[in-house]
Structures are given as C-alpha cells and as structure tokens.
Amino acid sequence: MSLTYYFSGSLTNDMMNYLSNMPNYEPIDVLVSQLDRSSIRKMFEFQDKGLVNKLFIDSGAFSFHTGKAKLDLEEYIDYLNSIDDRITICAQVDTIPGKFGQPKSKQDYEESARKSWENYLYMRTKLKSPQKLTPVFHFGESFDALRNILSWRGPNGEKVEYMGLSPANDTDVRIKNRYLNECYDVIHNSSNPDIGTHLYGYTSLPGIPKLPCTSVDSISHRHIAAYNKIYLPKYGIVSITDRPRTVGNKSSMSFIQTADEAAKSEVQDYLKSLGTTLEECRESSSMRCAVTMYGIIQYVKENPYKPDNVKKAKKLFNI
C-alpha cells in the first residue's frame, strides 16, 4: 500500500490553480483542523472540482492544549456526523500530556493516555462511521497504552482500524525515528499488526521511507514557502532570495547567490517544466508553495517504504 501524504492546513485558490496545472497532476490529500470550518468548506469545493481526494479532519486538540482555542466535544461529534460523507479519517479529541510549555511528569502521561482512551471510546458510540475515528498514542506515554489500543475489541469483534502516533516533534529526528520504530515493534507483535497508522506532524521527508506508516501529515510546504524557499527533488530545500548572505540569515544562503551556472540552468529548466520560473517563484508565495508540494509528491512516490531501509538500533525506550 502506498503512503498517503496529507498536506496540512488551508490551501488557497492560487496554490491549487498553480499545482493542478503542473504535469500529471493527481488529486491531493489534505488535513484541516475542525476549528477552521471555512477552510474545510473550501476543501469541499476542491473535492467537487476533482482537485482534492482524501480529507482528514483534525480535532484541534493541540490548539486547545496551548490555550488558543476552546473545544466542545459534543459539537465536534455533531459536526463530524454532518460531513461524514465527505471525510476519510477524523481525529479523536485527545488529551495532550501535561501543561503546555511545562515539564511533564509520569502522572501527566498516565492521565493523558487514560483520558484520551475514554474520549475515543465515547466518540465511537456517537459517530456515524466509528471506523474513521483515530485514537492517538503520544510520545512519552507507556507502551501499555499502545497495547491497549491494539488489543481492544468491540462488541462485534471489531478492531481499531486506524490510529495516530504523535511523536515529540521538537525532538531530534533520529530519536523520533528510533521511538517510532519501537512503536512499530509493539504493533507488529500485537494481535492487530495490520492496523493503519498516521504520524502527526511528521516533517522529515528522508525519514518517511524508513517507517511502515499508512499516512503522515505536514505543514512544511507552507513554512518553506513563507521563508522564500522551495523544495527541489535534486537539491532539497533551497533559498531563492536575491539578498546576499548576512550573519543574521546564515541558514538562508541563497541558491541564486551560490549555485554555479549549470545548476541554475538545471533548476530553471525544471521550473519551466512545471510552468513557472525562478523569478515568479521569488515573487509568489503561492507558486513557491505549489512547487514545493509538487516536489514532495514526487519524492513520496519515488521513495516508498522498504524494510531494508531501516537499520535496527539499540532500544532507547522501555516497552
């Protein structure tokens, strides 16, 4: 099964117009927070036009965790039921461990696992399509909580079909990948080894082929474009500003300022094949976003997961 890459966040008409006119365009998959209802309606419009395929609705639990939003569980359930025929997957209202910005205790992780599981079971009883609902397992919670998700059986013998893994996205990617591989060891040795898994906020493209996940989501295409950069399959993320490097922007050394003429010509030809130019990318954030999304799509297609991609390391986590 090929990986589903969900582009996270809102997409504009300009972004979709640019992207959909690039070679061999296929409908993309999108994750949107339920807190952004206007963007969800926009995704419905794109679905109707054949531009968006799968739609993943996130609960907005992280915004609630940071204090930036309020969540009404019953209203969220009603909303999911009202759009059930439009969505592929939806996230439970989970409890993120601890308090935002503060050190976490063992009790915080125990409480988050318990409350998240209770919410998941409750939401299952209320949704039109409970199989679309994903429970969430958070970095730092006991692996017993993961085993609990995997061993659960409903009154008719049904299993959890799809679950979310929430790694600590502020952790070094090497630590994060080792943790996720240990999660997959637990999954593969469980009574539900074929469960679908979604990695929340997973931004490392090189890491994707090393993990047997079903799907990931990332908003990196927006962040890359916002910093006047684009993702190129051959060169990775490059800055296309025409400003010279300074002490304050060492991480933004411009491709335009540093690349040789052969490389510049190669990139110009690549962008021309997509229907754009380096100059247009410098001027348009929407075009930078579209070019980056196109490159990500190509990378994911050309770099599928293979067990041989994984080098087993000594276990770091107590499972």
Positions of PLM-derived features:
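An almost-null, non-specific background feature
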Residues: 64-68, 96-99, 126, 142-146, ...
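Glutamate identity and glutamate-enriched acidic tracts
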Residues: 26, 45, 74-75, 106-111, ...
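Alpha/beta catalytic cores of nucleotide-metabolism and tRNA/nucleoside-modifying enzymes
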Residues: 1-23, 77, 81, 91, ...
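Glycine/Thr-rich beta-alpha phosphate-binding loop at enzyme active sites
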Residues: 101-106, 132-204, 212, 219-246
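Solvent-exposed, charged interface segments at domain starts and junctions
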Residues: 71, 121-147, 289-299, 318
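Non-catalytic, usually N-terminal nucleic-acid engagement modules in DNA/RNA processing proteins
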Residues: 1-128, 297, 304, 311-319
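Arginine residue identity/basic-tract feature
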Residues: 37, 41, 86, 114, ...
